[in-house]
């Protein structure tokens, strides 16, 4: 009873803090960039991280298994993963260029997890025999860390496409400034002077706005590539460990289960992204389109099976819980 109450308190505290963080971030964009607001936002995300960590540890203690057995627990772990991705850039250079992506993603996943749709999953249950394995922590945690990284990288690619096509189509409006201000990357440090001269040739000498926009798109492309590469690595480890676990549990490494099929499709999409990103003929827009497609595929892979409750991976799904 004590652990359940503590988990309930930590859930509401973390959700309240991250809501305040998003409000601060919006005020920072609408009013002006102030150090005080930025610091408050970062401290809020750290507090959210510790609250969700405490929540997961508490659930782990009283359930006696790693909290990744149903949709509710996986959503909370996904929100925890977003908070980690949020803090990494800040600790590296004290500038968070991902706050416009990670904070809304964290509140969306946690909000859905704590909604009335998943109320019955809030109470921990005994693991089914197939999930009583040491591979549970390895496989599911790697997949969810991969999903979080791939989603963040894909959203950066979506932002790149929005900025690029608004410029190409010549769409006016203040939203350009709002979108550009959402990603405080600052000045790009070019690896060599040749790269810098290439950037200057592609923008007008007298157009600082175009130069800054081009800098932003290049930085978005670079950050998207790095985060997606990390997520692709996590997903690969997760799929391989899942195959070993499947062989132990079901006697086969691969069964073309709906979850496995969509995981393979997701992996293939981002493998194509990495290939096009390293190809000189496809730059910026081409890989960004592929990554944007991957954003939708990830949600189909993650929510599709869990919401429909079909296949071998339907443990703790929404459909089974509702029934």
Curated annotation (Swiss-Prot):
Places the protein is found: Plastid, Chloroplast thylakoid membrane
Cysteine pairings via disulfide bonds: none
Major localization class: plastid
InterPro entries in the record: Cyt_c_assembly, Cyt_c_biogenesis_CcsA, Cyt_c_biogenesis_CcsA/CcmC
UniProt KW Chloroplast keyword: yes
GO function term, MF aspect, one: heme binding
Function: Required during biogenesis of c-type cytochromes (cytochrome c6 and cytochrome f) at the step of heme attachment.
Name of the protein this chain belongs to: Cytochrome c biogenesis protein CcsA
Gene source species: Calycanthus floridus var. glaucus
Source lineage: Eukaryota, Viridiplantae, Streptophyta, Embryophyta, Tracheophyta
Protein encoded by which gene: ccsA
């Amino acid at each position: 009873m004590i652990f359940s109450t503590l988990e309930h308190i930590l859930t509401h505290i973390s959700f309240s803090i991250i809501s305040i963080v998003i409000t601060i971030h919006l005020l920072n964009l609408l009013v002006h960039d102030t150090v005080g607001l930025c610091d408050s936002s970062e401290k809020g995300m750290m507090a959210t991280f510790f609250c969700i960590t405490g929540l997961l540890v508490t659930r782990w203690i009283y359930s006696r298994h790693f909290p990744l057995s149903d949709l509710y627990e996986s959503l909370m772990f996904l929100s925890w993963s977003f908070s980690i991705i949020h803090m990494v850039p800040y600790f590296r250079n004290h500038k968070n260029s991902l706050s416009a992506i990670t904070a809304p993603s964290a509140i969306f996943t946690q909000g859905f997890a704590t909604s009335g749709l998943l109320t019955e999953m809030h109470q921990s249950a005994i693991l089914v025999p197939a999930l009583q394995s040491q591979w549970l922590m390895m496989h599911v945690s790697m997949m969810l860390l991969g999903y979080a990284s791939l989603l963040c990288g894909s959203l950066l690619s979506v932002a790149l496409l929005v900025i690029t096509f608004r410029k190409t189509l010549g769409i006016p409006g203040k939203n350009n400034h709002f979108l550009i201000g959402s990603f405080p990357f600052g000045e790009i440090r070019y690896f060599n002077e040749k790269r810098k001269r290439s950037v200057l040739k592609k923008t007008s000498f007298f157009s600082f706005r175009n130069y800054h926009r081009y800098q932003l798109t290049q930085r978005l492309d670079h950050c998207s590539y790095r985060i997606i590469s990390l997520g692709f690595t996590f997903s690969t480890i997760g799929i391989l460990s899942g195959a070993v676990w499947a062989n132990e549990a079901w006697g086969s490494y691969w069964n073309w289960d709906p979850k496995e099929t969509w995981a393979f499709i997701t992996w293939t999409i981002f493998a194509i992204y990495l290939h096009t990103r390293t190809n000189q003929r496809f730059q910026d827009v081409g890989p960004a389109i592929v990554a944007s497609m991957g954003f939708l595929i990830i949600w189909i892979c993650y929510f599709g099976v869990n919401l429909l409750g079909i296949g071998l991976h339907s443990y703790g799904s929404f459909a089974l819980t509702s029934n």
